[in-house]
Amino acid sequence: MRRTLRFDPGLWYLRATAVGVATMLGTYGWSLYIEHEAGLHVDSVVQAVVISAAFSRVQRAFDRTDRLVACVVLPCAAAGGTELSSLIQHHPDLGDALFILGMAGSVWIRRFGLRATRAGTLLVLPLTAVLVVPGGIAAGGGHERTGWAAVTALFAVVWGTLVTWAAQRTGLVRRPPSAAVVTTAGPARTGIPASTRMALQLAVALAAAFVVGRSQWPDHWAWTVLTAFLVCSGARSRGDVLVKGAWRTLGASVGTMVAGAVAGSFGPRSDTAVVVIFSVLAVATWLRELSYAFWAACVTAVLSLLYDWFGQSSGDLLHTRLAGIAVGAALGLAASWLVLPIRTSAVTRARTATALAALGELLEADWHDARAVRAARGRFIHRVEQLGLATKPLKLLAALPVPHARLMGWQPDRGPLRVLAALRRCTGPVDRLVVAAAAPDVPADDPRVARSRTKTAAHTLALRRAIGRRPAPAQVPSQPTPPTAVSPAGPQTETVRSALLALSEIDAELDVLTGEFGLPPTALPTVPATDSAVPVSVRPSNV
């Protein structure tokens, strides 16, 4: 409990979970009403709960534009997922192929920016629901249920938006950062984009999972496919997929065994089981930020209870589930490590560079423009948080006791963790700079602050060049210029002293990063091309 309070000191995650549960319960009530009035099968209710549970989490970062997009994308995806579920039952090969294409495509479109990434996330939600309904549960309602699935998905978006809006207006949850803050614009990179690599990895993992699952467990292949998807889908790097695979296997095993121990306690169609399912989903949503293992354990327990609710004994399927989970995790891990792998070091270097770019924007911004300064500060904080997510696997691996590996010469790379710690220590001075820039006596006009800003900005740029292994522009010798008169600096006000101290602290932390990345490569100085400066041996011939 003490660790839990540390990970959620202001209970912000718990508050967001409460909003998510309200979204789930409202959508659940609507789906029950539609099921009764339209004569649909209970699988429509399961799909509605799965979509609303996932949407309640991903929509935390949505702004107004994202919600308008969700009103179009999610209903269409829900209708497509409903038809795909029937296709998989009647034409498995074609259905499996379309499922793989849909999942891989939702990852591939991330290359088109933030909006496309969030739209791709919405596409995944109904496809995930296809894997949740227990095998052998026939879908009812014909094509009519496709339209009702779209209506229910639209209700989930509208209801979730209203609940979230009310929670934000009352201060129950934080407002998400603007798109201008979370958008990462960087130079075009050569090679295969990360989104394409991840899409191919996911496609290979899902294809292998379908083949193995259908051949080994024809009635319960979904466990293998679902695990392969969960391990591969959000993996940022090889280290991330390794940790996720381990947590998924461990957590799912614990969840399956716990659910198996209570199997039969509620009976088919038990209302008590429904209450337990929603309670466990709430705990899973809250503790996911603490560890993915809690999420995996709780969600697997929910799926086991769902099988029990449908009358399929979870105790009889214990070994099948554990085997399917282990195989799915292994397939996801193998695909991420062998198919165009994304190195963890490359991810951490790239995210460090984007964080430094945001810091440079703050240092070079017009301090008379308070909005621009605050936006640059928000981008820096957000990108440091993204770096923290990328280094989570390294932090865990560094904490593991691996004496035999160390005897063989392997040591965990703690460099990215030191870089993250240094950038996090910069957040305090950055906040003080924002306060100083908003003061009535703006220190931007003070020559001492201007010199310090220029020096720190140059330090930041040098680090970015070192990370990208790009040489600095060669220095061209120039004729000496006569010294210019420098206007004397005024008295040091409290604001100026605070700004100078903050810049000095940032520069000191940048020295820590220089120790990790080194100096940028140097380019040979170039001399202005004059006829007399060209050696005789290399002058062009008249022949």
Language-model segments: residues:
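Generic, well-ordered alpha-helical scaffold segments in large soluble proteins
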Residues: 108, 202, 206, 210-215, ...
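C-terminal hydrophobic structural anchor segments
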Residues: 273, 283-299, 305, 458-479
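Generic detector of multi-pass transmembrane helix bundles and their immediately adjacent loops
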Residues: 274-278, 293-380, 384
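Secondary-structure capping and boundary motifs in well-ordered enzyme cores
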Residues: 76, 250, 254, 294, ...
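Long, intrinsically disordered, low-complexity regulatory segments adjacent to structured domains
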Residues: 384, 420-423, 427
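Short, hydrophobic/amphipathic alpha-helical patches that form generic packing surfaces
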Residues: 125-129, 428, 432, 505
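Long, hydrophobic alpha-helical segments that serve as membrane-spanning/inserting helices
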Residues: 1-39, 59, 110-114, 141-153, ...
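Alpha-helical transmembrane segments and their membrane-interface boundaries
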Residues: 1-282, 286-297, 313-314, 318-321, ...
